[in-house]
Amino acid sequence: MSVTVFNPRIDDAAASDITAVTPAVTALNELSSAQAPVKSATKKVFVTTQGCQMNVYDSGKMLDVLGDSHGMEVTHDIDEADVLLMNTCSIREKAQEKVFSELGRWRKLKEKRPDLVIGVGGCVASQEGDNIQKRAPYVDMVFGPQTLHRLPELYDQSHQQREIAPKNRIGTVDVSFPSIEKFDFLPEPRVEGFKAFVSIMEGCSKYCSFCVVPYTRGEELSRPLDDVLAEIDSLAAQGVREINLLGQNVNGYRGEKDDGNICRFAELLHYVSHVDGVERIRYTTSHPLEFTDDIIDAYAQLPELVSHLHLPVQSGSNTILAAMKRNHTIDVYINQINKLKAIRPDIHLSSDFIIGFPGETDQDFQDTLTLAKELNFDHSYSFIYSKRPGTPAAELPDDVSFKTKKERLAEFQKVIIDSTLAKTHEMVGTTTRVLVEQVANRHPDCLIGTADNTRTVMFPYAVDKMDELLGKIVSVRITDFVSPHMVKGEIEAVLA
C-alpha cells in the first residue's frame, strides 16, 4: 500500500507546535478505500497523504480513478513509481513550505527519470494554484479537493503537452470548485477490510476565524441521499461492517432526497442504520452549533451508533470562543454533553483544542483546563496556535509567547493523558463490543479489534477458527490493561 498517512492533528506529534493524544489504532483499517485493488498495468502510482480523514478518503479516490481509467497499480516504492501524487493539508504551520520542501526531493527523482509525472492535490494546491508551478515548474498537475475526479484528464493533458513541447512543457492546473460533481465521476468503491470512510459532504460554511477550510474546500455542499446510501450499500456488500461518515461539519448535512425534500444529518443516521451489514456507525467531524437534539436522540434510538463522540470545542473560554467566531458558549457545549450522557452514560468524548490563541489570558487557559477536567475527555487533538494565511485570525496580534504556549500545552496535555489512562484502566472488569479485524501480529494465537471507544482490544482464540470470527462484532470481557489505548480480554459471545 503506497499511501503514507499523516493526520494534521497527529502528524509530527513531537514537533514544537503540536502535541496530540490519540488512540493507538489510527488509520490502518480506515485506509481501506485507498487499498482497493486496481487493474493490472505497467504504470504505477505512489501517493503521500497529509491531513485529515477527508484527505485519506480523497487519496483512496485518486487511486480509484487512475486505476479505473488507466489501469494504474499502487506501489509502496517511490523509486518504481511512474506517477507521484501529493495530497496536501494546509492546517499545520508553514504547510506551504513543507510541500515545496518535499517537492524539492521529488525534483531530484524527476531529474533522473524525466518521464515521471508529479501531481499536487489537496488544500495547499487549492490555496496556491498556479504558484505551485511557478515555484516548482517540474510539477505536471495541480488539482484541488473538488477536482480530483479529473485526474485522468489532467494526466492525459500532461502527456500531450510533453509530446508537443517536451522542453517547454506547461503543467495543468485545475483548482476550481465545480459544486459537488466529483462524486458523479468516481468509480464504484472497492475496499479491503471491515471499516470504510464515506464522504457525505464537502466544505464548511462556519468561517471560524482561525480556519482555512472554507477557502480551500469551499462552502458546505451535501451529497444527495441516494448517492450516499448507494456507496454504503456497495461497501457493505463487500464486507464492511463499520461506516465512518465524513465531512468538515457532518452536522450540517442537508442532502436532497429523490422527492426533492431535504434529509438532515439525524435522519441520515437512521437511513444508514438500516443498510444490511452495517453494524457500527461513526462520524467526524462535528460542530457544536449544529449538534442538535435530534442527533442526540439518535443515540437512544440507534444501537449502531458507537459510544464515542468527537465534538471539537477549541477552548474552554467564552471570550476566546467569541474571538474564534465559534458562535456558541461553553454552557451550550456542556448542556449538549450532559444531554448525551443522560442517554448514553458510557459515551466516550474526544475534542480539539487550540492553545495560545491571540488574546488568551491565564484565566482563559484556566477555563480550558476546567472544562477538560469537568468533561473527562477520552483524548484530544491539541495544537499550539499558529497563523493560517488568509484567515481573519491572522490579522490579530499573536500576543501569547511561544514559551507560554508550550508550557500551557504541556499542562493541558497532562490533564488529557491522566484522563485517558484512567478511562482505559476503568475498562478492566467490564464488557465491551469489539469489531474483530485481524490476527495480532506479535501474538498469532490472539485476535485484535476495535472497541466503540476506539481502544484496541486483544483476546485469545482458537487458531483454526480465527477466520470465522473476522468481521464479526463480539462481546469481550476486559481482563488486563496493556497501554493507554490497548486492553486485553476474553471473548464472551458473538453478537453479529
Swiss-Prot record:
One protein family per Pfam: Radical_SAM
Subcellular location: Cytoplasm
Keyword Ribonucleoprotein on entry: no
Catalytic activity: N(6)-dimethylallyladenosine(37) in tRNA + (sulfur carrier)-SH + AH2 + 2 S-adenosyl-L-methionine = 2-methylsulfanyl-N(6)-dimethylallyladenosine(37) in tRNA + (sulfur carrier)-H + 5'-deoxyadenosine + L-methionine + A + S-adenosyl-L-homocysteine + 2 H(+)
A GO MF label: metal ion binding
Assigned keywords, A-Z: 4Fe-4S, Cytoplasm, Iron, Iron-sulfur, Metal-binding, S-adenosyl-L-methionine, Transferase, tRNA processing
Subunit structure and binding partners: Monomer.
Purpose of the protein: Catalyzes the methylthiolation of N6-(dimethylallyl)adenosine (i(6)A), leading to the formation of 2-methylthio-N6-(dimethylallyl)adenosine (ms(2)i(6)A) at position 37 in tRNAs that read codons beginning with uridine.
Protein name: tRNA-2-methylthio-N(6)-dimethylallyladenosine synthase
Record lineage: Bacteria, Pseudomonadati, Pseudomonadota, Gammaproteobacteria, Moraxellales
